[in-house]
């Protein structure tokens, strides 16, 4: 099993079926990027190897449209890749099944738990790999006994299950008054956060699933936060307790717990509010109410050594159009705070 966390938004027009444009666009882009590798590995064309399933017909159409735009499911293909609702794959199997849940942190998504066959059928159709493309923060929040809770147990059983892929733009956050830019790699991310701390007017929130005091010092973030606090800027750091302390060895886990406690205490002494939450996958920076940065970069834990660096990307949205999204993010965090 595997997953790609996508900070999208599930939508439902009046009387219509639900869809999530960012999930659809990301699935299409991911298939384009991996098509050659998949076909080489299996010795078969993509449509014989991969199936894409989702609970909603509108999402089926959104995924098909995204595939056509990238010319991966067009007339030149030997056959059409199967994209359908969960029941369209009953009686058929694929080596790789991609699942688009559609729901996001903006709504609960109980429908996925109302009928256990939805996820059971989807998972059972995958012979080799079942990959979920969606908002993992929502899946992670569910009770352990629910269908989504059981799925979360297996998806998050290993850090190796997390897929890495470049973030796609959220079209619903873009308007004529929105400025958007992209960050690539460690240096651009570090420069961005230091500049954002220096320019913040009221408050800044940094969501980083992992927190390493060494990285906070090494990057200059500590000094930048201290200067921001001296100007009266409210700073909140949100991190995941389990991510920071998880280890199979009890002694190692206690050691990691001590390091986390120490980091939290130091931040609190600086006047920086630190919130521990249950299982957060988003990596986000929010400045006041008009800047939102979303991506794959772990702000307070990413390695800065060249040979170990990952090529992370983030998207920065500036403008009034992000206010509602920021409100939804804060609401989701409140639900999972310890």
UniProtKB/Swiss-Prot annotation:
Gene Ontology molecular function terms on file: hydrolase activity
UniProt KW Hydrolase keyword: yes
PROSITE patterns from the UniProt entry: PLD
Residues of the PLD phosphodiesterase domain: 276-303
Any Pfam family: PLDc_2
A GO BP annotation: phosphorus metabolic process
Keyword Endoplasmic reticulum: no
Protein's recorded name: Putative uncharacterized protein YjhR
Organism: Escherichia coli (strain K12)
Gene that specifies this protein: yjhR
């Amino acid at each position: 099993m595997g997953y790609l966390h996508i900070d999208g938004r599930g939508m439902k027009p009046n009387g219509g079926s639900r869809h999530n444009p960012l999930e659809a666009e990301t699935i299409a882009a991911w298939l384009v990027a991996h098509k050659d590798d998949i076909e080489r590995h299996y010795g078969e064309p993509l449509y014989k190897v991969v199936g894409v399933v989702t609970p909603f017909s509108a999402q089926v159409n959104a995924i098909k449209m995204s595939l056509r735009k990238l010319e991966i499911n067009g007339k030149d293909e030997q056959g059409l890749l199967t994209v359908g609702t969960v029941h369209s794959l009953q009686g058929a199997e694929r080596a790789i099944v991609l699942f688009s849940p559609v729901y996001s942190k903006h709504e609960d998504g109980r429908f996925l738990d109302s009928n256990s066959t939805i996820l059971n059928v989807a998972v059972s159709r995958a012979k080799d790999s079942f990959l979920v493309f969606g908002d993992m923060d929502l899946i992670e929040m569910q009770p352990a006994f629910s269908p989504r809770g059981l799925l979360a147990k297996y998806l998050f059983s290993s850090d190796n299950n997390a897929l890495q892929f470049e973030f796609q733009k959220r079209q619903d956050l873009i308007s004529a008054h929105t400025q958007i830019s992209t960050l690539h790699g460690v240096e651009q991310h570090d420069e961005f956060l230091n500049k954002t701390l220096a320019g913040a007017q009221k408050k800044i929130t940094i969501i980083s699933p992992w927190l390493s005091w060494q990285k906070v010092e090494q990057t200059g973030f500590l000094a930048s936060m201290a200067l921001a606090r001296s100007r009266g800027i409210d700073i909140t750091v949100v991190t995941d307790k389990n991510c920071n302390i998880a280890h199979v060895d009890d002694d190692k886990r206690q050691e990691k717990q001590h390091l986390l406690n120490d980091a939290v205490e130091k931040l609190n002494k600086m006047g920086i509010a630190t919130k521990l939450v249950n299982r957060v996958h988003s990596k986000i920076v929010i400045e006041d109410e008009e800047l939102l940065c979303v991506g794959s970069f772990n702000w307070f834990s990413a390695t800065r050594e060249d040979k170990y660096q990952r090529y992370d990307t983030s998207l920065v949205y500036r403008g009034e159009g992000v206010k509602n999204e920021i409100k939804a993010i804060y609401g989701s965090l409140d639900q999972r705070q310890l």
